[in-house]
From Swiss-Prot:
Disulfide feature: 3-16, 11-28, 18-33, 27-39
Tissue: Expressed by the venom duct.
Name of the protein in its database record: Mu-conotoxin-like Cal 12.1.2d
Cellular component GO terms held in the UniProt record: extracellular region
Amino acid sequence: DVCDSLVGGRCIHNGCWCERSAPHGNCCNTSGCTARWWCPGTKFD
């Protein structure tokens, strides 16, 4: 299973690390981590 990216050694399948409390609400869209809302679809292995 190919990882889009790694954060803290964890595989992220949608390519972004999304956190509700992140300073910029960083989340995933087709351009990368630029969407300004929470995306609950982030999946870690």
